[in-house]
Amino acid sequence: MVNAILSKKKKLVADGVFYAELNEFFTRELAEQGYAGVEVRKTPSKLEVIVKASNTQGVLGEQGRRIHELTSLIVKRFKLSPEGIAIYAERVEERGLSAAVQAEALKAKLLSGLPIRRAAYGVLRFAMGAGAKGVEVVISGKLRAARAKSQKYADGFMIHSGQPTRDFIDIAIRHVLMRQGVLGIKVKIMKDPAANRFGPRALPDAVKIAEAKDEDEVIPAPTVKSYKQTAEDETETDAPVEAEAEVEATA
């Protein structure tokens, strides 16, 4: 039993190390193609690696040459059989809600010489326009002076703790080598809980208040007293009719 538990732990650690190295490899190789993450699926026949990027054509390359090069490098690094692994490219549908894509876009803007404030606000506007609930961009390093500091740009609503941070917030960290030194980029995007496809669709403290119904006239419940009153009213209304009938008969 102990050996079985240890083997499970070793397998989990090995899978985690494999995923971390694979993610680091694709982050380094596919930075220009808008790399946004990787998904590993194990099937009985082969290992499927799904690469998510904004530019899938750049991942595939001309006549599939680039993806074959990536496959050969992974096979050589992890000592896998060429027939036992398959790499697929998947396009990121919502680029504005992917923190990795926006971090790479911000990195490209900084390398092109765009001012830091203008580049950061461009990311904020693009993400909020795509339907994000909140966006936060932090850039740290030697921004203007010789002393390093950090600047934070935020828009919308953002949470910082608890399980909802795992459910609704996407985080990406990148580093860019500038002339004055290395700058750190951190992008946090909070997705709209109502548009969440998988998992909860609302925050834990969200309260839904039902709309008030129209106030109709309330009819009181009948009682014994009301029945008696109704009977007396009926006898009073019937008495004059009987008297008129007797007068007509005598005439």
UniProtKB/Swiss-Prot annotation:
Q: Where are the transmembrane segments?
A: none
Q: Where is this region: Disordered?
A: 223-251
Q: Does the keyword Ribosomal protein apply?
A: yes
GO annotation terms (biological process): cytoplasmic translation; maintenance of translational fidelity; nonfunctional rRNA decay; ribosomal small subunit export from nucleus
UniProt biased composition (Acidic residues): 232-251
Where is each KH type-2 domain found?
22-93
Q: Which GO terms describe its cellular component?
A: cytosolic small ribosomal subunit; fungal biofilm matrix; hyphal cell wall; nucleus; preribosome, small subunit precursor
Q: Does the keyword Zinc-finger apply?
A: no
Q: Recite the UniProt keywords alphabetically.
A: Cytoplasm, Ribonucleoprotein, Ribosomal protein, RNA-binding
| One example GO MF annotation | DNA-(apurinic or apyrimidinic site) endonuclease activity
Q: Which domain of life is it from?
A: Eukaryota
Q: Where in the cell is it found?
A: Cytoplasm
Function recorded in the entry = Component of the ribosome, a large ribonucleoprotein complex responsible for the synthesis of proteins in the cell. The small ribosomal subunit (SSU) binds messenger RNAs (mRNAs) and translates the encoded message by selecting cognate aminoacyl-transfer RNA (tRNA) molecules. The large subunit (LSU) contains the ribosomal catalytic site termed the peptidyl transferase center (PTC), which catalyzes the formation of peptide bonds, thereby polymerizing the amino acids delivered by tRNAs into a polypeptide chain.
Subunit note = Component of the small ribosomal subunit. Mature ribosomes consist of a small (40S) and a large (60S) subunit. The 40S subunit contains about 32 different proteins and 1 molecule of RNA (18S). The 60S subunit contains 45 different proteins and 3 molecules of RNA (25S, 5.8S and 5S).
Which NCBIfam families does the record cross-reference, listed alphabetically?
Answer: PRK04191.1, uS3_euk_arch
Q: Family per UniProt? A: Belongs to the universal ribosomal protein uS3 family.
- State the name under which the record lists this protein: Small ribosomal subunit protein uS3
Q: Which organism is it from?
A: Candida albicans (strain SC5314 / ATCC MYA-2876) (Yeast)
Recorded name of the encoding gene: RPS3
